[in-house]
Amino acid sequence: MSDEQKTKLIELKQKVNDLEFELDKIKNEFMMKIIIAVILIFFLTIVGLFYLIINLSRIISLNQKRKSLELKTKELNHEINKIEISLL
């Protein structure tokens, strides 16, 4: 049982690492789109507004995906903690 739990723990930690990497990519893309929109709105109001309107659905979907990944990561970390406690 202990070896099985250790194997599951290693798999979960790898999953969390993969999710955190994906989450970082999404956060970077999300922030880049927001920054570009703010800069364009500040300097070129019309172009910035069109950019924001065109990319609004992508920005919203990135934000939803980010929230989903954060929740999944939190759940996996909770499961990892439970396994680690049971191994003590």
UniProtKB/Swiss-Prot annotation:
Organism superkingdom: Bacteria
Keyword vocabulary terms for this entry: Membrane, Transmembrane, Transmembrane helix
Subcellular localization(s) per the UniProt record: Membrane
Membrane association type: Single-pass membrane protein
Membrane spanning residue stretches: 34-54
Record's GO cellular component terms: membrane
Presence of the UniProt keyword Transmembrane helix in the record: yes
Protein name: Uncharacterized protein UU064
Organism of provenance: Ureaplasma parvum serovar 3 (strain ATCC 700970)
